[in-house]
Design a protein with these regions (language model features):
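Sequence/fold signature of self-assembling virion shell proteins
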Residues: 1-21, 46-154
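Extended amphipathic alpha-helical segments with heptad-repeat/coiled-coil character used for oligomerization
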Residues: 1, 25-41
């Protein structure tokens, strides 16, 4: 998609719909389980919110004044991944939307003995307490890449 598509509130719905229409049938079959989500960057989240604000319904007015608990497209929640500050200095896509089952994304923290782990312990006599600091390694992975539907800004 072009950069203008990701900032135009009217185009956001088309992007979400394209992701759904072009998704693997196994993704679509899991909608009833309630674990699907659109993982989006903040610019897409904001543009979709502006799209909803532009609708003339009473609910749109109430949500624009009272705030929204969360956004969803056809019952599938949009999750703002809030990666803008981290992606700015990388070669990765700055704006994207990912449709998948939440259970398809794995986050792990290595708490076992590993060269990257560090644990420091000390006693603070002023507060009369033991303190500790630990450093762990974290990683994430996708279980099944065929269970992803992905759009990004070029």
């Amino acid at each position: 998609y072009e950069a203008a598509d990701f900032t135009n509130p009217e185009k956001i719905v088309a992007i979400l719909d394209d992701l759904w229409q072009n998704a693997d049938e196994r993704i679509k079959d899991r909608k009833a389980e309630g674990q699907l989500a659109f993982f989006v960057t903040s610019d897409l989240y904001y543009a979709y919110e502006k799209y909803l604000d532009s609708k003339g319904a009473d609910a749109a007015y109430a949500e624009s004044t009272n705030g929204r608990q969360g956004l969803a497209y056809h019952g599938i929640p949009l999750v703002d991944v809030r990666l803008g500050a981290y992606l700015a200095d990388t070669s990765l896509h700055k704006s994207f939307c990912l449709l998948t089952d939440r259970r398809n994304l794995v986050l792990a923290v290595n708490t076992s003995d590993f060269p990257g782990n560090e644990v420091r312990m000390w006693y603070n006599p002023d507060l009369m307490e033991n303190r500790q600091r630990a450093v762990f390694m974290a990683g994430c992975d996708v279980i099944d890449e065929t269970m992803l539907s992905y759009a990004f800004r070029v």
